[in-house]
Amino acid sequence: KKQVKLTIGIPTYNGEQFLKEKITSILNQDFTDFELIISDNGSTDATKEICSNFAIKDKRIRFFSHKKNLGAVWNFDFILKKACGEYFMWTAVDDKILPGFYEKNIEILEKNSNVVCSASQVKYFGKNRNYWVERSTRGYFKALKKKMVKRFQNLQNYPVSGTFQSKFRYYLKLRGHHHMFYGMYRTEQLKKIWLLDVNFTE
């Protein structure tokens, strides 16, 4: 199979509420050299029907439907093993990706050969957005920052020396920075160091 520039993976379970908007937003991006892998982890809603209909209409979509739920980590791993793109990223079914995201992150990776991952800032949207804004005005995030100083120091002291693999493993084990997990990686390198013993539940 001809290699595409980017593999985008959506692991999902009962995601019918978000799937149509999510898939449409990806297909409508200006960047087109990608494959979209959707792995349905035994959903009981209309997820399978929605994804199947999209896959029929667009050959860039590869849809896999599993009869039972095999766990979230298994689903992430399944998608990575199927990836054919030079670059790779998982994306949550309820996240939105703004225009230009793919091009900007690919450019960063191509200009910086030893960068572990290229990620973006996160903005809240939807019905919970005002909840987070209100909490921030009450000093919630200032208090949280004090409690998280030790955790954030792990990121601030991120190693700049060492092998690509060692830095990659360090990055994947960071706690409290889940949005960066959904950044963009080099597929070949990620497959080399990706291990299911990386504990995502700690």
Language-model-detected regions and their locations in the chain:
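Nucleotide-sugar donor-binding/catalytic module of glycosyltransferases
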Residues: 1-202
